[in-house]
Amino acid sequence: MNSFKPILLVAVSIFITSCSEKQARQPISHSSGTFMKESIDRNKKLNEQEKIAINKIIQKDTAFIYNRSEKGFWYAYENKSTENVFPVKGDVVNFDYEITDLYGNTIYSAEELKPQTYYVDKQNIMSGLRNGIKLMHKGDKVKFIFPSQSAYGYHGDDKKIGTNQPIICHVTLNEIKTETPE
């Protein structure tokens, strides 16, 4: 009987501890924030370099008057129409465009890109182009200069546009179809 008590005591203690609720362990974080700080500093330098390069291009291009958008890209009207309607969310626009690098080398021709149909703010396209189209009227041809963060960003387009590459888009807005409520 004496040998039964220790076994019973061990069994009861195992039973009691196994029935208790398990406590979640917190992950141990050793992050000092240096990676984020370095990344922020690197992006600030990149943005400043792009801004300097874009400003040089704008200064040399005296044929056009450039405007800076609230979204951080530049644009100039190569052909300004007399229309007064801007596309708004839900409208369907048809446009042609070509993409060059900052030095005028063609990355994608208008023939490669073909005419595009875009549902304003309802489809996913490059952020600069999404915002730029809303500044255009039917018949406008606009030259947009997009810093990399408004273009294809860190990843590029995985084809011809490289990492953190600023680009120039020549866009012609052919048509705006206003969405009609049903």
Positions of the model-derived regions?
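Cross-family detector of peptidyl-prolyl cis-trans isomerase
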Residues: 19-182
